[in-house]
Amino acid sequence: MEARFTRGKSALLERALARPRTEVSLSAFALLFSELVQHCQSRVFTVAELQARLAALGRQVGARVLDALVAREKGARRETKVLGALLFVKGAVWKALFGKEADKLEQANDDARTFYIIEREPLINTYISVPKENSTLNCASFTAGIVEAVLTHSGFPAKVTAHWHKGTTLMIKFEEAVIARDRALEGR
């Protein structure tokens, strides 16, 4: 009886707690997310309501993603600048969620409060087929909710929306107080 417990070390027991494998089957993710969209769609009447509901669910996920990333990161420091927070989202958060960095991060030419994260082929929209009457639907509103929660819980309150432009573009509009704080930090 003792032999079955001492036969060898299990690969599961040898894994580090700080960095668990977070791979999820793409087909399982696609099925789960499409069911989530169908569930939300059955409870709303307009595309705007559906996108708002997906964003709300994304905000719940975003708060948990931030907690998990901060808990796993050794020696991590808290970002104090807007650009650092955006690079954290573009890099670490995107890698944790989708296995790669976002394609592009840009700032609007005419507004210091507005930034864009561009994803040419978002994984979240890959397996969702949208009927013609709902052609404006962008399921990346879920991702926008995640990004909004990560930024807001990190101390950078912002409103994030998803748009169709060069693939999917997440438009991040920070509150004026965030930009004022960033400028004050630059002046030091």
UniProtKB/Swiss-Prot annotation:
Main location group: Golgi
Classification via InterPro entries: NO_sig/Golgi_transp_ligand-bd, TRAPP-I_su5, TRAPP_component
GO biological process, any: endoplasmic reticulum to Golgi vesicle-mediated transport
Role of this protein: May play a role in vesicular transport from endoplasmic reticulum to Golgi.
Keyword Endoplasmic reticulum found: yes
Stated name of the protein: Trafficking protein particle complex subunit 5
Family listed: Belongs to the TRAPP small subunits family. BET3 subfamily.
Quaternary organization: Component of the multisubunit TRAPP (transport protein particle) complex, which includes at least TRAPPC2, TRAPPC2L, TRAPPC3, TRAPPC3L, TRAPPC4, TRAPPC5, TRAPPC8, TRAPPC9, TRAPPC10, TRAPPC11 and TRAPPC12.
List of residues that carry Phosphoserine: 10
SUPFAM superfamilies reported for this sequence: Ligand-binding domain in the NO signalling and Golgi transport
Location of this chain's protein in the cell: Golgi apparatus, cis-Golgi network; Endoplasmic reticulum
Pfam families: TRAPP
GO cellular component terms, A-Z: endoplasmic reticulum; TRAPPI protein complex; TRAPPII protein complex; TRAPPIII protein complex
Record keywords, A-Z: Endoplasmic reticulum, ER-Golgi transport, Golgi apparatus, Phosphoprotein, Transport
Lineage: Eukaryota, Metazoa, Chordata, Craniata, Vertebrata
Gene behind this protein: TRAPPC5
